Protein backbone atom coordinates (compact mmCIF):
# COMPACT_ATOMS: atom_id res chain seq x y z
CA UNK A 1 0.00 0.00 0.00
CA UNK A 2 2.83 2.42 0.82
CA UNK A 3 4.29 1.87 -2.64
CA UNK A 4 0.96 2.63 -4.35
CA UNK A 5 0.45 5.77 -2.26
CA UNK A 6 4.02 6.89 -2.93
CA UNK A 7 3.61 6.41 -6.69
CA UNK A 8 0.35 8.37 -6.70
CA UNK A 9 1.95 11.23 -4.78
CA UNK A 10 5.03 11.21 -7.04
CA UNK A 11 3.13 11.22 -10.32
CA UNK A 12 0.50 13.62 -9.00
CA UNK A 13 3.01 16.22 -7.84
CA UNK A 14 5.31 15.99 -10.87
CA UNK A 15 2.59 16.00 -13.52
CA UNK A 16 0.42 18.44 -11.57
CA UNK A 17 3.32 20.84 -11.12
CA UNK A 18 4.23 20.57 -14.80
CA UNK A 19 0.66 21.34 -15.87
CA UNK A 20 0.47 24.22 -13.38
CA UNK A 21 3.51 25.75 -15.10
CA UNK A 22 1.59 25.63 -18.37
CA UNK A 23 3.17 22.45 -19.72
CA UNK A 24 1.36 20.08 -22.06
CA UNK A 25 1.24 16.41 -21.11
CA UNK A 26 1.24 15.23 -24.72
CA UNK A 27 4.85 16.41 -25.04
CA UNK A 28 5.84 13.90 -22.36
CA UNK A 29 4.14 11.05 -24.20
CA UNK A 30 7.22 9.53 -25.84
CA UNK A 31 6.71 5.75 -25.77
CA UNK A 32 9.74 4.99 -27.93
CA UNK A 33 12.05 6.92 -25.61
CA UNK A 34 10.62 4.84 -22.77
CA UNK A 35 11.16 1.68 -24.82
CA UNK A 36 14.83 2.56 -25.37
CA UNK A 37 15.47 3.30 -21.70
CA UNK A 38 13.42 0.43 -20.30
CA UNK A 39 14.69 -2.07 -22.86
CA UNK A 40 18.34 -1.15 -22.35
CA UNK A 41 17.96 -1.21 -18.57
CA UNK A 42 16.17 -4.56 -18.46
CA UNK A 43 18.49 -6.04 -21.10
CA UNK A 44 21.56 -5.02 -19.12
CA UNK A 45 19.97 -6.40 -15.96
CA UNK A 46 19.42 -9.79 -17.61
CA UNK A 47 22.97 -9.84 -18.99
CA UNK A 48 24.52 -9.01 -15.63
CA UNK A 49 22.63 -11.53 -13.50
CA UNK A 50 21.82 -15.23 -13.41
CA UNK A 51 18.26 -16.36 -14.06
CA UNK A 52 17.95 -17.26 -10.37
CA UNK A 53 18.60 -13.63 -9.45
CA UNK A 54 16.22 -12.41 -12.18
CA UNK A 55 13.45 -14.66 -10.86
CA UNK A 56 14.20 -13.72 -7.26
CA UNK A 57 13.95 -10.05 -8.24
CA UNK A 58 10.42 -10.65 -9.48
CA UNK A 59 9.63 -12.42 -6.22
CA UNK A 60 11.19 -9.58 -4.20
CA UNK A 61 9.10 -6.98 -6.05
CA UNK A 62 5.96 -8.95 -5.23
CA UNK A 63 7.00 -9.13 -1.58
CA UNK A 64 7.64 -5.38 -1.53
CA UNK A 65 4.22 -4.53 -3.01
CA UNK A 66 2.52 -6.91 -0.54
CA UNK A 67 4.83 -5.78 2.28
CA UNK A 68 5.51 -9.42 3.10
CA UNK A 69 7.37 -9.01 6.38
CA UNK A 70 7.03 -11.09 9.55
CA UNK A 71 4.04 -10.09 11.64
CA UNK A 72 3.55 -10.67 15.36
CA UNK A 73 2.02 -14.10 14.71
CA UNK A 74 5.16 -15.24 12.89
CA UNK A 75 7.40 -14.01 15.69
CA UNK A 76 5.25 -15.77 18.28
CA UNK A 77 5.17 -18.99 16.25
CA UNK A 78 8.96 -18.95 15.96
CA UNK A 79 9.43 -18.32 19.67
CA UNK A 80 6.81 -20.97 20.48
CA UNK A 81 8.59 -23.62 18.40
CA UNK A 82 11.91 -22.77 20.02
CA UNK A 83 10.42 -22.95 23.51
CA UNK A 84 8.84 -26.35 22.85
CA UNK A 85 12.09 -27.72 21.46
CA UNK A 86 14.19 -26.35 24.33
CA UNK A 87 11.74 -27.73 26.86
CA UNK A 88 11.95 -31.16 25.23
CA UNK A 89 15.74 -30.95 25.14
CA UNK A 90 15.67 -30.70 28.94
CA UNK A 91 13.03 -33.32 29.66
CA UNK A 92 12.82 -35.87 26.84
CA UNK A 93 15.04 -38.45 25.23
CA UNK A 94 17.13 -37.89 22.14
CA UNK A 95 14.91 -40.16 20.03
CA UNK A 96 11.78 -38.18 20.89
CA UNK A 97 13.42 -34.90 19.91
CA UNK A 98 14.83 -36.35 16.70
CA UNK A 99 11.33 -37.39 15.66
CA UNK A 100 10.42 -33.69 15.56
CA UNK A 101 13.45 -32.42 13.66
CA UNK A 102 13.79 -35.35 11.25
CA UNK A 103 10.24 -34.92 9.97
CA UNK A 104 8.96 -31.47 10.96
CA UNK A 105 5.90 -31.78 8.70
CA UNK A 106 4.63 -34.57 10.96
CA UNK A 107 5.79 -32.94 14.19
CA UNK A 108 3.14 -31.69 16.61
CA UNK A 109 5.51 -28.87 17.60
CA UNK A 110 5.87 -27.52 14.07
CA UNK A 111 2.23 -28.19 13.17
CA UNK A 112 1.23 -25.83 15.97
CA UNK A 113 3.23 -23.08 14.19
CA UNK A 114 2.03 -23.05 10.56
CA UNK A 115 3.89 -19.85 9.66
CA UNK A 116 7.19 -21.51 10.62
CA UNK A 117 6.35 -24.73 8.79
CA UNK A 118 5.52 -22.77 5.62
CA UNK A 119 8.99 -21.21 5.72
CA UNK A 120 11.07 -24.20 4.59
CA UNK A 121 14.41 -22.42 4.97
CA UNK A 122 13.68 -21.30 8.53
CA UNK A 123 12.40 -24.75 9.49
CA UNK A 124 15.59 -26.36 8.15
CA UNK A 125 17.69 -23.77 10.01
CA UNK A 126 16.00 -24.57 13.32
CA UNK A 127 16.19 -28.34 12.82
CA UNK A 128 19.86 -28.27 11.82
CA UNK A 129 21.01 -26.45 14.94
CA UNK A 130 18.78 -28.34 17.34
CA UNK A 131 20.35 -31.49 15.88
CA UNK A 132 23.82 -30.09 16.62
CA UNK A 133 22.75 -29.35 20.19
CA UNK A 134 21.53 -32.94 20.57
CA UNK A 135 24.92 -34.26 19.48
CA UNK A 136 26.31 -32.54 22.55
CA UNK A 137 29.94 -32.19 21.48
CA UNK A 138 29.82 -28.70 19.96
CA UNK A 139 30.61 -25.68 22.12
CA UNK A 140 28.41 -22.60 22.02
CA UNK A 141 31.08 -20.41 20.38
CA UNK A 142 31.50 -23.00 17.62
CA UNK A 143 27.75 -23.05 16.99
CA UNK A 144 27.68 -19.25 17.04
CA UNK A 145 30.41 -19.03 14.39
CA UNK A 146 28.56 -21.56 12.25
CA UNK A 147 25.26 -19.69 12.63
CA UNK A 148 26.90 -16.37 11.77
CA UNK A 149 28.38 -17.90 8.63
CA UNK A 150 25.05 -19.35 7.51
CA UNK A 151 23.09 -16.18 8.27
CA UNK A 152 25.68 -14.17 6.34
CA UNK A 153 25.26 -16.53 3.38
CA UNK A 154 21.46 -16.32 3.55
CA UNK A 155 21.62 -12.53 3.73
CA UNK A 156 24.06 -12.39 0.81
CA UNK A 157 21.76 -14.54 -1.34
CA UNK A 158 18.62 -12.61 -0.43
CA UNK A 159 20.31 -9.27 -1.15
CA UNK A 160 21.55 -10.19 -4.63
CA UNK A 161 18.35 -8.83 -6.19
CA UNK A 162 18.76 -5.61 -4.19
CA UNK A 163 22.30 -5.05 -5.47
CA UNK A 164 21.28 -6.00 -9.02
CA UNK A 165 18.39 -3.52 -9.08
CA UNK A 166 20.55 -0.82 -7.48
CA UNK A 167 23.08 -1.21 -10.30
CA UNK A 168 20.34 -1.01 -12.91
CA UNK A 169 18.79 2.04 -11.27
CA UNK A 170 22.14 3.82 -11.16
CA UNK A 171 22.55 3.23 -14.90
CA UNK A 172 19.16 4.64 -15.94
CA UNK A 173 20.20 8.35 -16.04
CA UNK A 174 23.05 7.48 -18.43
CA UNK A 175 20.71 5.35 -20.56
CA UNK A 176 18.33 8.32 -20.60
CA UNK A 177 21.13 10.40 -22.11
CA UNK A 178 21.57 7.74 -24.80
CA UNK A 179 17.86 8.03 -25.63
CA UNK A 180 18.14 11.82 -25.66
CA UNK A 181 21.15 11.75 -28.00
CA UNK A 182 19.28 9.46 -30.37
CA UNK A 183 16.41 11.93 -30.30
CA UNK A 184 18.78 14.82 -31.05
CA UNK A 185 20.24 12.85 -33.97
CA UNK A 186 16.73 12.48 -35.33
CA UNK A 187 16.05 16.19 -34.74
CA UNK A 188 19.21 17.18 -36.62
CA UNK A 189 17.78 15.42 -39.65
CA UNK A 190 15.05 18.05 -39.63
CA UNK A 191 17.39 21.03 -39.22
CA UNK A 192 15.88 22.74 -42.26
CA UNK A 193 12.34 22.50 -40.89
CA UNK A 194 10.45 25.38 -39.30
CA UNK A 195 11.59 26.35 -35.78
CA UNK A 196 8.40 25.04 -34.16
CA UNK A 197 8.89 21.61 -35.81
CA UNK A 198 12.56 21.44 -34.83
CA UNK A 199 11.74 22.64 -31.30
CA UNK A 200 9.15 19.88 -30.86
CA UNK A 201 11.67 17.24 -31.93
CA UNK A 202 14.34 18.56 -29.54
CA UNK A 203 11.78 18.69 -26.72
CA UNK A 204 10.88 15.07 -27.43
CA UNK A 205 14.57 14.16 -27.29
CA UNK A 206 15.00 15.83 -23.90
CA UNK A 207 12.22 13.65 -22.51
CA UNK A 208 14.74 10.79 -22.64
CA UNK A 209 16.98 12.50 -20.10
CA UNK A 210 13.96 13.30 -17.96
CA UNK A 211 12.73 9.71 -18.02
CA UNK A 212 16.14 8.29 -17.15
CA UNK A 213 16.57 10.49 -14.09
CA UNK A 214 12.92 10.14 -13.05
CA UNK A 215 12.89 6.34 -13.28
CA UNK A 216 16.18 6.07 -11.41
CA UNK A 217 15.50 8.35 -8.46
CA UNK A 218 11.70 8.38 -8.17
CA UNK A 219 10.76 4.79 -9.11
CA UNK A 220 13.60 2.26 -9.00
CA UNK A 221 15.49 3.82 -6.08
CA UNK A 222 12.55 3.82 -3.64
CA UNK A 223 11.48 0.34 -4.78
CA UNK A 224 14.98 -0.99 -4.15
CA UNK A 225 15.04 0.57 -0.68
CA UNK A 226 11.71 -1.11 0.08
CA UNK A 227 13.03 -4.49 -1.11
CA UNK A 228 16.05 -4.12 1.16
CA UNK A 229 13.87 -3.30 4.16
CA UNK A 230 11.56 -6.27 3.53
CA UNK A 231 14.41 -8.75 3.09
CA UNK A 232 16.20 -7.50 6.21
CA UNK A 233 13.05 -8.00 8.28
CA UNK A 234 12.62 -11.50 6.86
CA UNK A 235 16.19 -12.35 7.88
CA UNK A 236 15.47 -11.19 11.44
CA UNK A 237 13.79 -14.56 12.11
CA UNK A 238 17.16 -16.30 11.75
CA UNK A 239 18.74 -13.94 14.27
CA UNK A 240 15.94 -14.72 16.74
CA UNK A 241 16.66 -18.45 16.41
CA UNK A 242 20.39 -17.86 16.79
CA UNK A 243 20.19 -15.74 19.93
CA UNK A 244 17.61 -18.00 21.58
CA UNK A 245 19.49 -21.26 21.01
CA UNK A 246 22.84 -19.74 22.00
CA UNK A 247 21.35 -18.46 25.25
CA UNK A 248 20.01 -21.95 25.93
CA UNK A 249 23.41 -23.51 25.20
CA UNK A 250 25.03 -21.05 27.60
CA UNK A 251 22.83 -22.23 30.45
CA UNK A 252 19.69 -20.09 30.32
CA UNK A 253 16.37 -21.78 31.04
CA UNK A 254 13.97 -21.81 28.06
CA UNK A 255 11.87 -18.90 29.37
CA UNK A 256 14.94 -16.67 29.73
CA UNK A 257 16.46 -17.87 26.45
CA UNK A 258 13.31 -16.70 24.65
CA UNK A 259 13.91 -13.19 25.96
CA UNK A 260 17.29 -13.12 24.20
CA UNK A 261 15.46 -13.84 20.96
CA UNK A 262 12.54 -11.49 21.63
CA UNK A 263 14.84 -8.56 22.34
CA UNK A 264 16.35 -8.81 18.84
CA UNK A 265 12.97 -7.91 17.31
CA UNK A 266 12.44 -4.26 16.41
CA UNK A 267 10.46 -2.38 19.05
CA UNK A 268 7.88 -1.54 16.37
CA UNK A 269 6.97 -5.23 15.86
CA UNK A 270 8.16 -6.89 19.07
CA UNK A 271 5.45 -8.97 20.80
CA UNK A 272 4.93 -8.25 24.48
CA UNK A 273 6.33 -10.55 27.13
CA UNK A 274 2.75 -11.42 28.10
CA UNK A 275 2.04 -12.53 24.53
CA UNK A 276 5.16 -14.71 24.60
CA UNK A 277 4.14 -16.26 27.92
CA UNK A 278 0.70 -16.99 26.50
CA UNK A 279 2.37 -18.63 23.51
CA UNK A 280 4.43 -20.83 25.83
CA UNK A 281 1.28 -22.02 27.58
CA UNK A 282 -0.75 -22.39 24.38
CA UNK A 283 1.53 -22.84 21.33
CA UNK A 284 -0.15 -21.68 18.15
CA UNK A 285 -3.16 -20.52 20.13
CA UNK A 286 -3.28 -17.22 18.30
CA UNK A 287 -3.53 -18.83 14.90
CA UNK A 288 -6.13 -21.32 16.12
CA UNK A 289 -8.33 -18.59 17.50
CA UNK A 290 -7.84 -16.64 14.33
CA UNK A 291 -8.95 -19.60 12.28
CA UNK A 292 -11.98 -20.05 14.53
UniProtKB/Swiss-Prot annotation:
Chain segments annotated as coiled-coil in the UniProt record: none
The keyword Transmembrane appears for this protein: yes
This protein's GO CC annotations: plasma membrane
Record keywords: Cell inner membrane, Cell membrane, Chemotaxis, Flagellar rotation, Hydrogen ion transport, Ion transport, Membrane, Transmembrane, Transmembrane helix, Transport
Record's keyword annotation contains Transport: yes
Localization, UniProt: Cell inner membrane
Parts of the chain that traverse the membrane: 3-23, 27-47, 171-191, 204-224
Major location (coarse): membrane
Membrane topology: Multi-pass membrane protein
Matches recorded under PROSITE patterns: MOTA (PS01307)
A Gene Ontology BP annotation from the UniProt entry: proton transmembrane transport
Free-text function comment from the UniProt entry: MotA and MotB comprise the stator element of the flagellar motor complex. Required for rotation of the flagellar motor. Probable transmembrane proton channel.
Assembly behavior: Each stator complex is composed of 4 MotA and 2 MotB subunits. 2 A subunits and 1 B subunit are thought to form a single ion channel, so that each stator complex contains two channels.
Record family assignment: Belongs to the MotA family.
Name of protein: Motility protein A
Protein species of origin: Rhizobium meliloti (strain 1021) (Ensifer meliloti)
Amino acid sequence: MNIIIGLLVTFGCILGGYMAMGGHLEVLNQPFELMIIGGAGIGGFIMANSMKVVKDTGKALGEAFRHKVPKEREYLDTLGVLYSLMRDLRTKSRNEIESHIDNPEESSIFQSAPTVLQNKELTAFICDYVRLIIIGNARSHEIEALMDEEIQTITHDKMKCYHAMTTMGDALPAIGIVAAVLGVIKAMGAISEAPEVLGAKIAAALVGTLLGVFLSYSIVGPLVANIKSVREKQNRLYVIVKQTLLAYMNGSVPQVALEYGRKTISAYERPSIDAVEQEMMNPGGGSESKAA
